[in-house]
Swiss-Prot record:
UniProt keyword annotation of Mitochondrion present: no
Signal peptide: none
Record field: catalytic activity: cytidine(1402) in 16S rRNA + S-adenosyl-L-methionine = N(4)-methylcytidine(1402) in 16S rRNA + S-adenosyl-L-homocysteine + H(+)
Name of the molecule in the record: Ribosomal RNA small subunit methyltransferase H
Entry's EC annotation: 2.1.1.199
PANTHER family to which the protein is assigned, alphabetical: 12S RRNA N4-METHYLCYTIDINE METHYLTRANSFERASE (PTHR11265:SF0), S-ADENOSYL-METHYLTRANSFERASE MRAW (PTHR11265)
UniProt cross-references to InterPro entries, sorted A to Z: RsmH (IPR002903), SAM-dep_MeTrfase_MraW_recog (IPR023397), SAM-dependent_MTases_sf (IPR029063)
Length: 312
């Protein structure tokens, strides 16, 4: 099994992590280990990297790719559990944390995973294959209102109501089992003139279902705060997002952690006692260069936001 994954914003991420050779770093989304391999190159034997992934295929491939390194610990888990993971490893604080929230190239390119609307496969979309809940359960189990809600909110799809209606109508005849069956339903629901414009008509709906299956947005807010709590002073957190929903959450959470004061604006001094935990390094997100876009088109929607822990 070959886990091909071209890391996005690699140089920008490594630069912004401010890697110390004896530091401890966490790659929350190990994936193809593109970012991790570059971190490890910059660590001494006293440094350490913790690589977390909920996808066993990714961990297996990464362990093979990084087998020469002895200062690396693999963890099969969701990065939302970062506090517990580090506590179990007897690690109090770390120097840097990276999270690349995109679906890996491998997951998209491996048809059987069901992430892609370009290949026919069972409706799956589980990043953690140990989980029992899959895209099949969403498509065949959610009522019309709930389907509409996730497609609208997570996919930002203007035809969410029609798509939800068409899904429910189709599954009343027989279960919807495959990605291509779902693609056909989506295409039928979207008026022809809109199908001919812009990205693939199924893109937004597939994104929405994937987010729901893996509970991606629900865990992000808390995970950012937990991650910041585990950073040393001047430690950095780098988060790469791939759609506006994630980016908005990261941006707003960073702002909240930089300026948590809840006092009314007309009070001359803070009395709520909430102190800033970070300073935002990237006022605007870092995006892929024109050069990177040429060799890695999947970087087109990537945005990197960086924050630094401050002394409390």
């Amino acid at each position: 099994m070959e886990f091909n994954h071209v890391p996005v914003l690699l140089e920008e991420t490594i630069e912004n992590l401010n890697i110390k050779e004896d530091g401890i770093y966490v790659d929350c989304t190990l994936g193809g280990a593109g970012h991790s391999s570059e971190i490890l190159k910059r660590l001494s034997s006293k440094g350490r990297l913790i690589g977390i992934d909920q996808d066993k295929d990714a961990l297996k491939a990464a362990s093979e790719r990084l087998k020469e390194y002895k200062n690396l610990t693999f963890v099969h888990d969701n990065f939302s559990n970062i506090k517990n993971i580090l506590e179990e490893l007897k690690i109090d604080k770390v120097d840097g944390i990276l999270a690349d929230l995109g679906v890996s190239s491998y997951q998209l390119d491996e048809p059987e995973r069901g992430f892609s609307y370009m290949n026919d496969a069972p409706l799956d979309m589980r990043m953690n294959r140990d989980s029992e809940f899959s895209a099949y359960d969403v498509i065949n189990g959610y009522d019309e209102e709930k389907l509409y809600s996730i497609i609208k909110n997570y996919g930002e799809e203007k035809f969410a109501k029609r798509i939800a209606k068409f899904i429910v109508e189709k599954r009343s005849e027989e279960a919807i089992n495959t990605t291509f069956e779902l693609v056909d339903i989506i295409k039928a629901a979207i008026p022809a003139k809109f199908r001919r414009q812009g990205p693939h008509p199924a893109k937004r709906t597939f994104q929405a279902i994937r987010i729901e299956v893996n509970q991606e947005l629900e865990i992000l807010n808390k995970t950012i705060e937990d991650s910041v709590d585990k950073l040393k002073s001047e430690g950095r957190i780098c988060i790469i997002t791939f759609h506006s929903l994630e980016d908005r959450i990261v941006k707003n959470k960073y702002r909240e952690l930089q300026d948590p004061c809840m006092c009314p604006k007309d009070i001359p001094m803070c009395v709520c006692g909430k102190k800033p935990k970070i300073k935002i390094i990237t006022r605007k997100p870092i995006e892929a260069s024109s050069y990177e876009l040429e060799y890695n088109p999947r970087s087109r929607s990537a945005k990197l936001r960086v924050a630094e822990k401050i002394n409390l």
